[in-house]
A protein has these predicted regions:
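C-terminal substrate-binding subdomain of Rossmann-fold SDR/epimerase-dehydratase oxidoreductases
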Residues: 263-266, 270-380
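N-terminal Rossmann/SDR dinucleotide-binding element
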Residues: 2-4, 9, 15-23, 32-35, ...
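NAD(P)-dependent short-chain dehydrogenase/reductase
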Residues: 211-270, 275-279, 283-284
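Active-site YXXXK catalytic motif of short-chain dehydrogenase/reductase
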Residues: 72, 154, 202, 206
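NAD(P)H-binding glycine-rich loop region in Rossmannoid oxidoreductase-like domains
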Residues: 114-153, 164
Length: 380
């Protein structure tokens, strides 16, 4: 992915002052191409809305961010990156699950559920949040196995976030995915603007998120920003059942026993990206001046390859790797409906997107991280 994994939850934190940001009284950017002024957002009528305010709202000394997270693969590295850049105690990570030790002791951690609107709203208010990163979603194959849960997390959770972001004038980031396209979309390359028509609940919910975010931008002035992630490859997490997870599984299996069974056809080409590039792009689009954004949802890409091409690159490190293909019909049908290659020229032009990792560098990096005490180290 571009696919979020696991259960709903979130992370948040305070982001230090950026000299490119406007004065404190307006800590978010808005951008609109139409001539009408955005309408004022009317918040949900919770009991607290009916009570008079005792004082004017307080603005934070520096921007603050809240990240909803459904998985550790993306949100934990994102939180760690922000902590390194902005301070350990300025980013608070949260989930509905008990965190592992390395997450818990790395910085502040609290509990929250993306479906609990009142609790999320209290967190935004109590911590004076100004940036929000919304990652909660069930990924493609998992979502197909539990459509009601995917509908609740991916759509109802999004509605909670949109309302909170609009009410409190937040800068909102929502990741989208290659799964937002369908079999009638142009596949090679796939432009930012084209017919989508996905055939998974995950993809449908992501198109819904893109369009709702754009609607809230034009209707209420919400500073909505979205990136369509390709398949994301990381050494820091185990594969989680996604259609592109074969590209992570191959490294673990190659190191463990020198054998790999691929659940996609050998020539199935999909756009991919190393996680460091994914995090780099996410931070870059959030820091980009609003005036530089010509659209609200951008494709980003780094490389495109097939399982066979990945296998050949892996064999440069483990020549004796044995590969078999046992195609999973569900995952193959999903992959066949997705882009083969992303056109990300708008992101490169508008806010200077540039990837760092190609296929060779990705494979070498994965083995350097995973293989230091393994078969790779013995071979080398």
């Amino acid at each position: 992915m571009g696919e979020a994994r696991g259960q709903p939850g979130f992370a948040w934190g305070k982001i230090p002052k950026n000299p490119s940001l406007p004065p404190k009284k307006n800590l978010f950017y808005t951008f609109s191409t139409h001539t009408q002024q955005p309408s004022k957002f009317t918040p949900r009528l919770l009991p607290s809305n009916l009570l008079p305010s005792s004082s004017a709202p307080l603005l934070p000394l520096t921007p603050a961010s809240l990240c909803t997270a459904s998985e550790y693969k993306l949100i934990v590295p994102c939180a760690f990156l922000f902590r390194k850049r902005f301070g350990k105690n300025n980013v608070i990570l949260s989930d509905i699950r008990k965190p592992p030790d390395d997450v818990f002791y790395n910085g502040p951690f609290i509990y929250s559920d993306i479906l609990d609107y009142k609790n999320l709203r209290e967190i935004v208010v109590n911590n004076r949040i100004t940036w929000l990163f919304h990652y909660s979603a069930l990924l493609s194959a998992v979502g197909e196995a539990n459509v009601p849960l995917a509908r609740a997390v991916n759509i109802t959770g999004l509605h909670n976030i949109l309302d909170i972001a609009a009410e409190h004038s937040l800068r909102l980031f929502v990741p989208s995915t290659i799964g937002a396209f369908g079999p009638t979309s142009p596949r090679n390359p796939t432009p930012d603007l084209c017919i989508q028509r996905p055939r998974t609940i995950y993809g449908v919910s992501k198109v819904h998120a893109e369009l709702m975010g754009e609607y809230y931008h034009y209707r209420y002035g919400l500073d909505f920003r979205c990136l369509r992630y390709p398949g994301i490859i990381s050494a820091d997490s185990q594969p989680g059942g996604g259609t592109t997870d074969y590209a992570v599984q191959i490294f673990h299996d190659a190191i463990k026993n020198g054998q790999f069974q691929c659940n996609l056809k050998s020539d199935t080409r999909l756009p991919m990206m190393y996680i460091d590039d994914c995090l780099k792009a996410t931070l870059a689009v959030m820091e980009a001046p609003a005036a530089s954004l010509s659209m609200r949802t951008y494709n980003i890409s780094a490389m495109s390859f097939s399982p066979e091409e990945l296998v050949q690159e892996v064999k440069k490190h483990i020549p004796e790797l044995q590969v078999t293909y046992n195609v999973d019909a569900v995952r193959q049908a999903i992959a066949d409906s997705w882009p083969m290659n992303f056109d990300d020229s708008n992101a490169r032009r508008d806010w200077g997107w540039k990837h760092d990792f190609d296929l060779s560098e990705l494979v070498t990096t994965m083995f350097n991280i995973l293989g230091s005490d393994s078969r790779v180290a013995q071979i080398n």
